[in-house]
Amino acid sequence: MLGLQRETSSMYKRTSSRDYSPMIDVEDSSGLLENDVDNEMETTNPSWKCSLPHVLVATISSFLFGYHLGVVNEPLESISSDLGFSGDTLAEGLVVSVCLGGAFLGSLFSGGVADGFGRRRAFQICALPMILGAFVSGVSNSLAVMLLGRFLVGTGMGLGPPVAALYVTEVSPAFVRGTYGSFIQIATCLGLMAALFIGIPVHNITGWWRVCFWLSTIPAALLALGMFLCAESPQWLFKQGKIAEAEAEFERLLGGSHVKTAMAELYKLDLDKTDEPDVVSLSELLYGRHSRVVFIGSTLFALQQLSGINAVFYFSSTVFKSAGVPSDLGNIFVGVSNLLGSVIAMVLMDKVGRKLLLLWSFIGMAAAMALQVGATSSYLPHFSALCLSVGGTLVFVLTFALGAGPVPGLLLPEIFPSRIRAKAMAFCMSVHWVINFFVGLLFLRLLEKLGPRLLYSMFSTFCLMAVMFVKRNVIETKGKTLQEIEISLLAKP
């Protein structure tokens, strides 16, 4: 469990996993794998309780991600007034969006940090700029200092999601990996809602926006400290040649009876990859033997953003205001829809599978965008159009949270081979942030030039394209170990 005393790495000799000679003959590892898998299937799955505390600590990074996405929404007017740029829409936009620049930079380095320092240390490195940036934002007395603080926070936001996806995927037993992966999305929703509720007093208490930033240092510090007690990824330890430590961490996460099977799977994969270099280059990701899965991952993230989710979040306040609903109440409705969809996804992820959730999620989002298109019709009464618009917004957020939101972050670490997993996630997340930036930058301009009907039709078309892409390219990973998924992908021509 979480509180067990960690054995120091100095007790173990650091050797290459390929040179290490275990007690069992490595040449027999393939047969051992098959026998052990059969035996284990005849008994029971590993206990989910062993890995749960480690997953919960890791999802603090996702809570922080959601919190910092929403922390300036309510206080922005007070911030601009206190710092002297009230009415300057460009400056206000920079305060909101400068995080994206930091997040893009952080995502570029996330793979190197996760592979170089390990998953646990990567979380701690992620927490540092979040603590420093939140403190700087809270004490800022000018726009420049505020932007510096927000940029620092953004770098932590860019580091956190890829590392969280990697860690949760690598420490979770196969039969609950989908459920645990959904915790990431739920934590993000809770962070967004926490930022909303904490920001409510900002209109009545002078300088409350500073408290909103400072409060975020508490979960960031808990993340950094909690990781001292958490298990390191056994896959990462194995790659580093720390065989005994990998076995010890498997025992903490799965239980002693499942260690031999898990290690045999790693040895089988290691034998299959003896001709591959240790260093993963960008050219290998784009043109190497695993380029197809990298293409699938980056395209999924691109389609996720091109579906219009951030535009819907951005425009939801206007939609609710036009229907006579206060913006803060409208934000609560959106937050509840997001959380409800995420909870349903958590329940269904390991029952119906990732692919089916993705398909129905994008289908539902396309239908919701069709409702938005219908709401722009001049033939509808005003009240009916408002109902369609509000209903379309809530249905879109709900169906997004069912699959298109949580599944890519879970699915990609599952289908990426262990050797390239961190670097491939970093590449795909950088694609995510670039598309995110341009959608946010161009949405209002396109809305003005094209009108809502054509723009929402484009978003609906992207959702339908995503349905076809998922149906053709995405494999089902439900209930399979990471090693089984990798072996099946390697077996494909």
Curated annotation (Swiss-Prot):
Show the GO MF annotations. Answer: transmembrane transporter activity
Q: In the UniProt record, does the keyword Transmembrane occur?
A: yes
Where does the record place the region Disordered?
A: 1-24
> Which family is it part of?
Belongs to the major facilitator superfamily. Sugar transporter (TC 2.A.1.1) family.
- The answer to keyword Transmembrane applying to this record is yes
Membrane topology term? Multi-pass membrane protein
Q: Which UniProt keywords apply?
A: Chloroplast, Membrane, Plastid, Sugar transport, Transmembrane, Transmembrane helix, Transport
Q: Which NCBIfam families match?
A: SP (TIGR00879)
Protein name per its UniProtKB record? Probable plastidic glucose transporter 2
- Where does the chain cross the membrane? 52-72, 94-114, 128-148, 151-171, 182-202, 211-231, 293-313, 329-349, 356-376, 392-412, 424-444, 450-470
Q: Which Pfam families match?
A: Sugar_tr (PF00083)
Q: What is its main location?
A: plastid
Biased composition, Polar residues: where in the chain? 1-14
